[in-house]
Amino acid sequence: MNVQNEKSMTVRGKDRYKSGVMSYKKMGYWEPDYTPKDTDVICLFRVTPQDGVDPIEASAAVAGESSTATWTVVWTDRLTAAEKYRAKCYRVDPVPGAEGQYFAYIAYDLDLFEPGSISNLTASVIGNVFGFKPLKALRLEDMRLPVAYVKTFKGPPTGIVVERERLDKFGRPLLGATVKPKLGLSGRNYGRVVYEALKGGLDFTKDDENINSQPFMHWRERFLYCMEAVNRAQAATGEIKGSYLNVTAATMEDMYERAEFAKELGSVVVMIDLVIGYTAIQSMSNWARKNDMILHLHRAGHSTYTRQRSHGVSFRVISKWMRLAGVDHIHAGTVVGKLEGDPLTTRGFYDICREEYNPTQLEHGIFFDQNWASLNKVMPVASGGIHAGQMHQLIQHLGEDVVLQFGGGTIGHPMGIQAGATANRVALEAMILARNEGRDYVSEGPEILAKAAASCTPLKQALEVWKDVTFDYASTDAPDYVPTAVPAA
């Protein structure tokens, strides 16, 4: 069927409110003639109907169940501005190359959402509707957030520009490392890793997502040893350093206590995990803003709902929500590392974090223009399976405003942690110098690294150990678009 040509079937007048069951199309949730307002929130869903279910009806059901509808007509609709508050599915397209899947464009009136609340937004657009029986699967692919709604959020407490000013580091990616092994180290040994990595040339070290307060190392002990390491490394190098102290805990009271202690010790940054939830993330963002702290977000748990192509929530949507919620850093993929990341899709994530305005770019998976209304920018973090030998590729794909985190690529160095950090710093400086000189650092990357390694034994060792190690697997989440040939002039 040609889903794009099906006309409105909305029942008008008294018949609309007769008791009984009525199709979602007839209840007014399918409005192909509707033109979205500048103030509408627009969602793009990938809808996979059950066999025999009309895709228009399935898409209208998504609109209804994520806004005002229930399974039967209710007379109390007449006590509301029902036609205004109904979400309106106004377009349904087949997904290119995916039989039985459809893109449904749904517009929501801004008054349906509480200002400045990610929890309220998500309770509607990814609430009960994802369990709706007539659907095999449902995925939220993208959203257009109107300026009127964006302005109700505070956004990142620090932002890229101010973070660079505080660190006094410009013109290059920042370097970091996640402490490994992620679990099992004592506080003293943990602090030793932090010191050696920072002294060797890194800007940051980082707790991993699941290091909180365990029997082998309580949080207070870790914070004390880490900040001793940071202070010693700063004194030794003359550079501002930091360590992402994970304050994730069982309750908000515990998290505030840990964050306050980190501040008292002089930390410039604290860390939280995505799994703490949207309300907790916004609460910690408010705390970070009041206390002039950088807020780092580890996206722990995201792949449980972002990785599958047909069901869940795209990470581009999570990126938008987190920019609104107010985090300064977010892990956003590496392209060449060990974790999921199609190159074009990942560039879309980075654009969402870093740009003031996102134009529609279907090849990057971005379906809508997005104006960020001067909201601070988020620093993306690339972490997971990267090493010095990939430096030219990382800069090519990810650009300059990014934190490159070499965990195993620092701590696994055969000459030790400090040497691993030095290898990464020298590789980065060599590549940035080549870029600034106007050289083709991408094609000349291996040559540039080899020349730098000739006078840097740690880098030479790193290149010998990891060579051209990469994780070359097909992505499960590539953009859905069909390139169109440009006619000859």
Curated annotation (Swiss-Prot):
The active site is at K180 (proton acceptor), H298 (proton acceptor). Its EC number is 4.1.1.39. Mg(2+) binds at K206, D208, E209. It comes from the Bacteria. It catalyses: 2 (2R)-3-phosphoglycerate + 2 H(+) = D-ribulose 1,5-bisphosphate + CO2 + H2O; D-ribulose 1,5-bisphosphate + O2 = 2-phosphoglycolate + (2R)-3-phosphoglycerate + 2 H(+). The keyword Metal-binding applies. The keyword RNA-binding does not apply. The record marks K338 as: Transition state stabilizer. GO terms for biological process: reductive pentose-phosphate cycle. Keywords: Calvin cycle, Carbon dioxide fixation, Lyase, Magnesium, Metal-binding, Monooxygenase, Oxidoreductase. GO terms for molecular function: magnesium ion binding; monooxygenase activity; ribulose-bisphosphate carboxylase activity. Substrate binds at N128, T178, K182, R299, H331, S383. The modification N6-carboxylysine is found at K206. Its cofactor is Mg(2+). Binds 1 Mg(2+) ion per subunit. The basic functional RuBisCO is composed of a large chain homodimer in a 'head-to-tail' conformation. In form I RuBisCO this homodimer is arranged in a barrel-like tetramer with the small subunits forming a tetrameric 'cap' on each end of the 'barrel'. HAMAP family: RuBisCO_L_type1. Heterohexadecamer of 8 large chains and 8 small chains. RuBisCO catalyzes two reactions: the carboxylation of D-ribulose 1,5-bisphosphate, the primary event in carbon dioxide fixation, as well as the oxidative fragmentation of the pentose substrate. Both reactions occur simultaneously and in competition at the same active site. PANTHER family: RIBULOSE BISPHOSPHATE CARBOXYLASE (PTHR42704), RIBULOSE BISPHOSPHATE CARBOXYLASE LARGE CHAIN (PTHR42704:SF17). This is Ribulose bisphosphate carboxylase large chain 2. It comes from Nitrobacter winogradskyi (strain ATCC 25391 / DSM 10237 / CIP 104748 / NCIMB 11846 / Nb-255).
